[in-house]
Amino acid sequence: MEQITGSIKQGGWDAVCILGPTASGKTRFAVELARTLSAQWKPCEILSADSRQVYRGMDIGTGKDLAEYGEVPVHLVDIVDAGTKYNIFEYQRDFSKAYTNILERGCFPIICGGSGLYIEAATRGYELYEVLPDEELRACLEPKPMEELVQMLKELKAAKGEKPHNSTDWDTKKRVIRAIEIEMAQGEQREPLPLPQKVLFIGVDVDRDTRNARIDARLQARLEEGMVDEVKRLLESGIPAENLIYYGLEYKFLTQYIIGELSYDQMVKGLGTAIHQFAKRQMTWFRGMERKGVEIHWVKR
């Protein structure tokens, strides 16, 4: 920890990102780091990069142990209602607001999470754009021949100094029109969102057998804590079963159990296997980040 804190204090970083698969202990590590830096350097606050902890009322199933943070402020947890669909574009917008607020108060941001897409949206220095369908533009473009649409798309990209890089943009008229729609909408966007440009990535990892054992023990503990009752309450509040199933993992399997699609034993076994596979996919994502040039400093916990 001393080597890490020294690097942070001397490195001129915009933020630190603590990432890792589920059950790796990354939250505990992030809190320890925040407390150490707050005592030695400047106040630190945590920005969650978890795609499901944003939802209110989804606590046990997402491992949202707010007590673990203690006195350390945490952002981007409990910000939208369960049953809604919060997307990556909204997350990047909300992250930027929270990140800017932390900096304005003279604090240091520590990003913590295991959702690779959210981590990249927050730290890779590019802004995502949610481009809604423009029916008026589509009606105008549809009668045009394919050759004219392709040329229009090439000119739009050239005006931004870009070269066509995705051959699938050109294979159907529908794809070309959608690509034009996106290019034109992006050209009208506001100034880029403030996002951290220089980020120190620290990965928290455990060996596979230990990780899987932790996952199984944690699953049993959460079931004993009332995870089934939590999902029942969400269903009783009026959230459709399919909306909870959409969230995957705990909420998918427990909902299927409650509505009679799975037995209890099938639910427990299937959920345990699914979480093991999920952790493996998380590690695959992080290795992919490394292949793209992101330097992740791995620590064992």
Which residue stretches match the model-derived regions?
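Phosphate/pyrophosphate-binding catalytic cores of soluble transferases and nucleic-acid-acting enzymes
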Residues: 1-301
